[in-house]
């Protein structure tokens, strides 16, 4: 029975009621057919209320279950909630059921169950009508059954306003599938600040969305230049919580731009050094993705993934065993695609494998060579393009992967001791942990955030301040300093050298923790000190930057001297500093000069290390040679320690530069002022001392010019001495002739009475002087001849023979003079005068003979000394040549032995490889025969 619409009901309700009335009139059965109409029994009303409660509870349970299952999707409104949809379904259901029953059963079966189906349909229609009437009573105040259950118009309109409130709820905006409508970051931060409870789901979900967007943007902006800055910004977020998002974004970014795989691998390596579990998760996901694409035969994705894995191997994130497993998998059953993928993988990580696993790389290339040879023999040949790729890979290996470096210098950011290598293989990586990509409520959110904040401060310190805030802070600091400047009246000075000790410790630890000298120089140069007078960062007592540089240079020299043996690391480091700035070069030059001044206080080990350091700096022209200008190679100005120091320096210079190059450097006229004291030319005695010193240490070749200068000086001195001797002999002969003429005049005047006696006495007195004068001129002539002959010949024996002849001639002349005087009898004063003359003449002759003997003795001594020195030099040169020849023979024998050992090992490996291949072929042949036999 249908009701007429009430005039007090709203228009929409009246339309629904009219529509229901039309449907009831069009239905095939009437309400009277239903024995359980809601107007007939109150018991049915109670059952309807209980069924309504059950349906509500089941709806709530279903909604809660759907919320737990899909937290990010809002509860969708079902179309069944509308009465209009129910009415359409109600009108459709009989025909559908009839059509299904007609299709599913035969006609006889339909006739037999006709009554039962009619009853079932009538019961379902009555049940739908009752539920429809109840919903209509709830919606329309004019259709309510009792005044007790009536509702106010405000309450009736309230359900229509609830969906609008839900649209404005930020929680529902973030629960949708795409994250809801776009919310600007400023508005999202404002919404997040308005939530006081940080452990609530709404706050954590907002934080998750913000973190996801920021990580995605940072990963997309990374490149080789801003890698460090991007890492610092990434670590500002909780990467432990968002490691799934981070790994997903890195993999997606690498897949979109495979050319930047090395950049993303460097980013992963930096994060892996601080958070190893993130690097392991990334590697595991890549391996799972590689296996999935390999099974699907997706070559493009496989090539991109193995490029990323190869660069992770280069960055020491993944172990090289993973590379070998991939190569074995690709080349075990070679195809065009697998060989192409393997060669692409080798290009990326071949340089690293050559460095850390050369034997494994050789086996891989042997397999490629075998594949190429099998391709040429068999009918099932690979594509010609793949064969060319294998040949290209062989050429790349021959060039030692020069075009494919393992790690670019700009991306080599992790120290070797900080690298953490994950030994995952293809079988271990199973679970990619995709559940980390979705949001999960954290009951201990604040505690975990505080823990990560402490970790972040340990890694990168406090968060960076924006430029505006920095300027404000700097302005505030300047104002505060300007205000506090007049107040400062006292200053505390620390004289305990604690700052110096701390600085030296820092420099020493920096040197010990550096891998090579370039890294050490970079770290030491980063230790900046302000140029102002007050230094509060490292050293409080150092007032200027130049003093800081001097202290650093002295520390480097001390570290080099303290080593047990000389280390080339310090020489290369100091050379780098000298080439960087002139201030460092001048500082090291001053230190070298001070070292020679205090060399007697240094023990032999430090002395040797410092000498080798100075020799290295001189040979590389890192410092100037003027540091040797203070060295004076004389017996008075040198000590034993100083001579040992100079000896070590020149021995190292010869070893580094060679004798010829060092000799040209020493004889260079532009550097003559640097070696004035080393090779003195002012005093022959000092020159002999320098010559003897360099000859004793086996470097007599450096003193050739000094020897020539000394020989020229000796010859010049000898010429001067000979001239003086000739002048002295001529003056002696003239004085003798004048004395003889005076004596003859006196004898003529005294004996005037006796003419015969006077004439005889005058004749006898005149004849001997004439003979003596003649003999004097002859002797002078002969002496000049003998001197010329001696200079021409330079023979000591000829000189001695001439001297003996001269002495013999003089003795014969004296004997003849004495015999003539004895033959002529003298009397009185004449006899006495002639005796005095003989005595004076004999004294002069003896003194002259003594001088000649002394000159000859000194000449013989000098010649013997020169001969002895030449013999020693010759013996030393022979010994050094023999030692060098022995060393060369040993080196040649060692190189020959190494070459033979290498050849033997290679031949052994080839034989083993050939034997292994033969066994494998034999096994394959036996297996194929067995299969053929079974078939």
Swiss-Prot record:
One of its GO terms (molecular function) is RNA binding. Keywords: mRNA processing, mRNA splicing, Nucleus. Residues 1-179, 463-489, 725-935 are annotated as: Disordered. Residues 729-763 have a biased composition (Low complexity). Belongs to the CWC22 family. Residues 13-25, 49-70, 159-175, 780-891, 897-935 have a biased composition (Basic and acidic residues). Gene3D superfamilies: 1.25.40.180. Residues 84-148 have a biased composition (Basic residues). InterPro entries: ARM-type_fold, CWC22_splicing_factor, Initiation_fac_eIF4g_MI, MIF4G-like_typ-3. Required for early embryogenesis and tissue differentiation. Required for pre-mRNA splicing and for exon-junction complex (EJC) assembly. Hinders EIF4A3 from non-specifically binding RNA and escorts it to the splicing machinery to promote EJC assembly on mature mRNAs. Through its role in EJC assembly, required for nonsense-mediated mRNA decay. It is found in: Nucleus; Nucleus speckle. Residues 212-400 form the MIF4G domain. It comes from the Eukaryota. It holds the Pfam family MIF4G. The keyword Nucleus applies. This is Pre-mRNA-splicing factor CWC22 homolog. PROSITE patterns: MI (PS51366). GO terms for cellular component: catalytic step 2 spliceosome; nuclear speck. Residues 502-633 form the MI domain. SUPFAM superfamilies: ARM repeat. Residues 465-483 have a biased composition (Acidic residues). One of its GO terms (biological process) is mRNA splicing, via spliceosome. The gene is let-858.
